[in-house]
Amino acid sequence: MPLEGGNGIAARDSPLSRKLLRDRASNQMHRRQTHSPRPSVTEPRRALLLAVRSFVRAAQVCPGVLRIALMGSLVTSKAIPKDADVLVTIDNMMDLTELASAGRRLKGSAQTINLGADIFLADTTGRYLGRICHYRECHPRMACLAQHCGRREHLNDDLHVVTLSKELLARPPIDLWPNVVRRLTVPPDVETLLLTELERPA
């Protein structure tokens, strides 16, 4: 299957180019390292992929959501991913309430198997905004690492903790919505459980 770029032009498909894309999917997400994942189920990838699919279905109808993409360890063949990493491009003026609710459901599904999920946000200019906050209501907390807590509801702008490169924002490994776009060789479970289902007519 040809690999598609964000502009619809076929990219070179070679073992080296696929390896570089996989490396970029992790290297361009700069975050502090924590403990190794210890999921409570034998097939954590399946559980996370199903949770991501549900998130996409919910997020795609949120006014202001323009693109949903998948990145991180789920786009690799890593048997035990640490979490589900989703990138959502938004209209910078959108109300984040509905998207945050969908994000908390994704996080909750991941937490039930002792894993995590992050919903990263970018605007239409390719600027990284931060992550969806996992708290339902915004008020001062010692655990909150947002640089401007409360300035925008449901946005955790902890850019000193996590940053995404402009290249990753522009060309994430897999676009999930509004169109499925593969920029690397997709693991079989991602293809079967996620992409094939998302490509089915509504």
Regions found by a protein language model. Give the residues of each.
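Aromatic/basic-lined ligand-recognition segments
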Residues: 87
